[in-house]
Amino acid sequence: MVAAHAAHSQSSAEWIACLDKRPLERSSEDVDIIFTRLKGVKAFEKFHPNLLRQICLCGYYENLEKGITLFRQGDIGTNWYAVLAGSLDVKVSETSSHQDAVTICTLGIGTAFGESILDNTPRHATIVTRESSELLRIEQEDFKALWEKYRQYMAGLLAPPYGVMETGSNNDRIPDKENTPLIEPHVPLRPAHTITKVPSEKILRAGKILRIAILSRAPHMIRDRKYHLKTYRQCCVGTELVDWMIQQTSCVHSRTQAVGMWQVLLEDGVLNHVDQERHFQDKYLFYRFLDDEREDAPLPTEEEKKECDEELQDTMLLLSQMGPDAHMRMILRKPPGQRTVDDLEIIYDELLHIKALSHLSTTVKRELAGVLIFESHAKGGTVLFNQGEEGTSWYIILKGSVNVVIYGKGVVCTLHEGDDFGKLALVNDAPRAASIVLREDNCHFLRVDKEDFNRILRDVEANTVRLKEHDQDVLVLEKVPAGNRAANQGNSQPQQKYTVMSGTPEKILEHFLETIRLEPSLNEATDSVLNDFVMMHCVFMPNTQLCPALVAHYHAQPSQGTEQERMDYALNNKRRVIRLVLQWAAMYGDLLQEDDVAMAFLEEFYVSVSDDARMMAAFKEQLPELEKIVKQISEDAKAPQKKHKVLLQQFNTGDERAQKRQPIRGSDEVLFKVYCIDHTYTTIRVPVAASVKEVISAVADKLGSGEGLIIVKMNSGGEKVVLKSNDVSVFTTLTINGRLFACPREQFDSLTPLPEQEGPTTGTVGTFELMSSKDLAYQMTTYDWELFNCVHELELIYHTFGRHNFKKTTANLDLFLRRFNEIQFWVVTEVCLCSQLSKRVQLLKKFIKIAAHCKEYKNLNSFFAIVMGLSNVAVSRLALTWEKLPSKFKKFYAEFESLMDPSRNHRAYRLTAAKLEPPLIPFMPLLIKDMTFTHEGNKTFIDNLVNFEKMRMIANTARTVRYYRSQPFNPDAAQANKNHQDVRSYVRQLNVIDNQRTLSQMSHRLEPRRP
């Protein structure tokens, strides 16, 4: 889950340390920690808790580099594996020689493989890590023991034993494709096809509840209706159903959302269109509940009405969780020609988060949105295609799983949600290398047909312009329709524009300078295009290259044309350079003060423009703006108070005397304690962005000797990491209770945590139970907003590509991410330090109330941190405490948990955030994850050219931060006027235990595990 990413390395290191122990040495707390991590992994989501706990006892952790072969085809297996991170290629050879092996698919996160160890059959394929990967490994003896003990749980979870399929053996043959219910590739899907043949119990119950609620509260909605001289019995109208649902619950925010919720019932046949159409519409169309299909449909009893009142909100919550997926399926089931612009945008947004498509350009993804087809199959065992057939389609799994089967070898692997297969068929004409068989009922796929995909690629290539020098590409442009309406006004021909796909840094800069439009009416459009370059240039063209290039472009003189033409060109060229410099300086702001090259360039550039302005009146508009920026940055840099000192405590709590927190800059100095092996310490004073090498030098000066010193960061659980000499800004990357140690390398193993790192021994419930939940949420939001506002957009870029590559600090981002962990552990700490059961119940209520108020204030970061704290295993296992929580609060918590649902790449959260207007504090770990996803899924350089499409995607994500902050956070007047100093101080100085093992032990002491 994303939160594990947010907690940086501590929580992950914790569970890995537990797995590294020998099974006999693992305590119940170790198992709890491993269990918490594994239950969020896709491969284990359907495993029974008892089985998963046994896996926690016997599993091992493996971290493998790219290119490692786990086993070869024909080997006798000794281990079963599950993929926790990364991906692996499955290679098969007809001759059993690895030289001619063909990659038939890729195993992604959540995939499990290796069941052949149950009967010692040879491995059917070679498995090679595609990238750095994390695996869970279970040895053969342990896996067989699990199989014997939990066969009833595992039988439906592991790949079915198809056995060896020898050629000519009738018994071993895969079911014939003609005998399986399969939608033919080129037969258009009709929306009338139902997705499930039998409605699920949950959906049946939901339909009954909604029907009873309507009959109880608005009985006029269900009645006989006449239309075109025909009578339709006991029907509702689509628009009325949407109106009614919006009125019933606060969890429905739009008509589109309500449509999706009714679509859930329609897909399962619990609600039906009178003409059997299968997509629900917010129109004057007639729909009938399943119960009303009967002539003698009963009216609800008083007992049923009472049950309905109790269950209605839970039903609404269930449908609101299922609605987005149903709405997406509804769109995908429309024939491509019937999809609206809004439909295409929804599909495109979904495609952005599918790893299998991450390497494709924006244009290709948008084109795919128009041709993707939804395909579903009700029965496990259905053959999607057979080995040896012509490949005509590429599939992406939306729901369910499939087995990859090869004749003579059986099941070689299983693919799950998010994995793809059949892609080779789109790029060559080779026959299918394997058969694909559904391993469970009700599987959903996205399908791309070869003809459509090849057409898209042909169109893209036809619209691609390649500029060459010395027979080498130096700039690749793509022709796309102009996005703004102004470009098309008064012109019968649709306007075209060119976007940069890739190029050398110099040619990319040259292109942007040449295409800057100087007309005032086009300022906004020009700024938007330039923004990608000025935000991302640090990745491929640092200021040491950019500044000289800008000077050269500014002074460039054309060699051809009349004197007037040359003068006009030179003038406009200079104005374009000034325009880019203004936006560049505005983006970087006071970060430029830390860059000597940039400061020298700005001063030199200002002098050049000032000289030219005396002779050219056209510069009169731009000069004052440039002068203002240069003076502001120069004066700030020279101000004596500029270098404010940052104390150790400030990293956690901020300066209580200051009215507002100020951003930390790399040149700011920090007073920091570095500890020795005997827990004595020396205080050093270095810049925040100092490298580890500089930290060692400062420590050596204090200690009198630096011979063989290393710098180690250690968390409260004793996890130690030796820092590399080129690591920078290490002070803010520590965990909440982490500390820095300095010692000779030979003393590394003897380092132990400080007693103070253990955290508090008594809770603060006595203090904050007297504070209003709304006051606490308000002050938390005020502080979080200050932290969030201090984060510069470029820190996101430095964090994504590695700050050591830029020698820049990400201190403000680090502290904001640490705040998430601090609030999360604050919740767990307070609950685990509360020994009285009734007080713990009150604590749960308090935290749920605070979370609700944070959500009202649009502080999604703290909202998620609190909810994740409540879902921490040390809290969630306290069954006696949760049993006594009133049902109203349980419902609130269930609704909050539903927003944390990580499925479909956190779609529940994304939909919620998309409905909110700024100001907004986002769930920052997910934004970081999105940028990392784009970075890792796309190369920075392609054929020695900068992949600018990747730069554009990352810049687009980073820009959401600017959007969230585009409106100021206006404090609640009623809250701001209160005497809030105590609450303000409390939320800024949280004291927590961040050792999961300690928290689990405390939890077990509060409520020992039931026998």
Swiss-Prot record:
<keyword id="KW-0116">cAMP-binding</keyword>
<comment type="subunit">
    <text>Interacts with RAP1B, RIMS1 and RIMS2. Probably part of a complex with RIMS2 and GTP-activated RAB3A.</text>
</comment>
<dbReference type="InterPro" id="IPR019804">
    <property type="entry name" value="Ras_G-nucl-exch_fac_CS"/>
</dbReference>
<dbReference type="GO" id="GO:0016020">
    <property type="term" value="C:membrane"/>
</dbReference>
<dbReference type="GO" id="GO:0007189">
    <property type="term" value="P:adenylate cyclase-activating G protein-coupled receptor signaling pathway"/>
</dbReference>
<dbReference type="GO" id="GO:0046879">
    <property type="term" value="P:hormone secretion"/>
</dbReference>
<dbReference type="InterPro" id="IPR029071">
    <property type="entry name" value="Ubiquitin-like_domsf"/>
</dbReference>
<dbReference type="GO" id="GO:0098693">
    <property type="term" value="P:regulation of synaptic vesicle cycle"/>
</dbReference>
<dbReference type="GO" id="GO:0007188">
    <property type="term" value="P:adenylate cyclase-modulating G protein-coupled receptor signaling pathway"/>
</dbReference>
<keyword id="KW-0963">Cytoplasm</keyword>
<dbReference type="InterPro" id="IPR036390">
    <property type="entry name" value="WH_DNA-bd_sf"/>
</dbReference>
<dbReference type="GO" id="GO:0005085">
    <property type="term" value="F:guanyl-nucleotide exchange factor activity"/>
</dbReference>
<keyword id="KW-0472">Membrane</keyword>
<keyword id="KW-0114">cAMP</keyword>
<dbReference type="GO" id="GO:0030552">
    <property type="term" value="F:cAMP binding"/>
</dbReference>
<feature type="binding site">
    <location>
        <begin position="432"/>
        <end position="433"/>
    </location>
    <ligand>
        <name>3',5'-cyclic AMP</name>
    </ligand>
</feature>
<dbReference type="GO" id="GO:0007264">
    <property type="term" value="P:small GTPase-mediated signal transduction"/>
</dbReference>
<feature type="domain" description="Ras-GEF">
    <location>
        <begin position="772"/>
        <end position="1009"/>
    </location>
</feature>
<dbReference type="Pfam" id="PF00618">
    <property type="entry name" value="RasGEF_N"/>
</dbReference>
<dbReference type="InterPro" id="IPR036964">
    <property type="entry name" value="RASGEF_cat_dom_sf"/>
</dbReference>
<keyword id="KW-0677">Repeat</keyword>
<dbReference type="InterPro" id="IPR000591">
    <property type="entry name" value="DEP_dom"/>
</dbReference>
<dbReference type="GO" id="GO:0030674">
    <property type="term" value="F:protein-macromolecule adaptor activity"/>
</dbReference>
<dbReference type="InterPro" id="IPR000595">
    <property type="entry name" value="cNMP-bd_dom"/>
</dbReference>
<dbReference type="GO" id="GO:0017157">
    <property type="term" value="P:regulation of exocytosis"/>
</dbReference>
<dbReference type="InterPro" id="IPR023578">
    <property type="entry name" value="Ras_GEF_dom_sf"/>
</dbReference>
<feature type="domain" description="DEP">
    <location>
        <begin position="216"/>
        <end position="291"/>
    </location>
</feature>
<keyword id="KW-0547">Nucleotide-binding</keyword>
<dbReference type="InterPro" id="IPR000651">
    <property type="entry name" value="Ras-like_Gua-exchang_fac_N"/>
</dbReference>
<comment type="function">
    <text>Guanine nucleotide exchange factor (GEF) for RAP1A, RAP1B and RAP2A small GTPases that is activated by binding cAMP. Seems not to activate RAB3A. Involved in cAMP-dependent, PKA-independent exocytosis through interaction with RIMS2.</text>
</comment>
<dbReference type="InterPro" id="IPR001895">
    <property type="entry name" value="RASGEF_cat_dom"/>
</dbReference>
<dbReference type="InterPro" id="IPR018490">
    <property type="entry name" value="cNMP-bd_dom_sf"/>
</dbReference>
<dbReference type="Pfam" id="PF00617">
    <property type="entry name" value="RasGEF"/>
</dbReference>
<dbReference type="GO" id="GO:0030073">
    <property type="term" value="P:insulin secretion"/>
</dbReference>
<feature type="binding site">
    <location>
        <begin position="422"/>
        <end position="425"/>
    </location>
    <ligand>
        <name>3',5'-cyclic AMP</name>
    </ligand>
</feature>
<protein>
    <recommendedName>
        <fullName>Rap guanine nucleotide exchange factor 4</fullName>
    </recommendedName>
</protein>
<dbReference type="GO" id="GO:0017156">
    <property type="term" value="P:calcium-ion regulated exocytosis"/>
</dbReference>
<dbReference type="GO" id="GO:0031267">
    <property type="term" value="F:small GTPase binding"/>
</dbReference>
<dbReference type="InterPro" id="IPR008937">
    <property type="entry name" value="Ras-like_GEF"/>
</dbReference>
<feature type="domain" description="N-terminal Ras-GEF">
    <location>
        <begin position="496"/>
        <end position="634"/>
    </location>
</feature>
<dbReference type="GO" id="GO:0005829">
    <property type="term" value="C:cytosol"/>
</dbReference>
<dbReference type="InterPro" id="IPR036388">
    <property type="entry name" value="WH-like_DNA-bd_sf"/>
</dbReference>
